């Protein structure tokens, strides 16, 4: 009878471990998506910084291509190369000198780097937890095979 109780206990533990494994897998996917988003936004900010740095040395009317979205662009003339419109969040855009816009983007990249580091650390901890669950499930499997 103790054997039936042990078997039921192991089955319950396996179900619990499977639930943990599923939850950890979902968390891992979510964190991975967040990390990819941050990496994409970081790349965009760095590209914008490079463009602004090139822009800051220009004088007068500057011809450019303006991306309208959906793969559509138009030729445009930038008449003021000293002031840039910067989205600061929550749909708010402010006018800033180019140098301040560059600093703003550098600060944003620094914040994204810190967030990416935290996410990477969380992913590492989550992987450790997933390995522990997998190891315990292997132990249970081995126990049931040796009976």
Swiss-Prot record:
Main function: Molecular chaperone capable of stabilizing a range of proteins. Seems to fulfill an ATP-independent, HSP70-like function in archaeal de novo protein folding.
Summary of subunit composition and partner proteins: Heterohexamer of two alpha and four beta subunits.
UniProt GO molecular function: unfolded protein binding
Localization per record: Cytoplasm
Entry keyword set: Chaperone, Cytoplasm
Name of the featured protein: Prefoldin subunit alpha
Family as reported in the entry's similarity comment: Belongs to the prefoldin alpha subunit family.
Source domain of life: Archaea
Listed InterPro entries: PFD_alpha_archaea, Prefoldin, Prefoldin_subunit_alpha
Keyword Cytoplasm applies: yes
Annotated GO CC locations: cytoplasm; prefoldin complex
PANTHER family named in the record: PREFOLDIN SUBUNIT 5
């Amino acid at each position: 009878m103790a054997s039936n109780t042990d078997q039921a206990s192991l089955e319950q533990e396996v179900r619990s471990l499977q639930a943990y494994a599923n939850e950890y897998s979902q968390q891992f996917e979510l964190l991975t998506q967040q990390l990819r988003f941050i990496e994409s936004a970081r790349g965009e900010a760095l590209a914008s910084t490079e463009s602004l740095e090139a822009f800051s040395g220009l004088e007068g009317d500057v011809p450019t291509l303006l991306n309208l979205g959906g793969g559509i662009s138009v030729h445009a003339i930038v008449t003021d190369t000293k002031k840039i419109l910067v989205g600061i969040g929550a749909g708010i855009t402010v006018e800033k000198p180019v140098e301040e816009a560059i600093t703003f983007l550098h600060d944003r990249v620094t914040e994204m780097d810190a967030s990416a580091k935290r996410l990477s650390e969380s992913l590492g901890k989550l992987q450790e937890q997933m390995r522990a669950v997998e190891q315990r499930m292997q132990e249970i499997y081995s126990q049931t095979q040796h009976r």
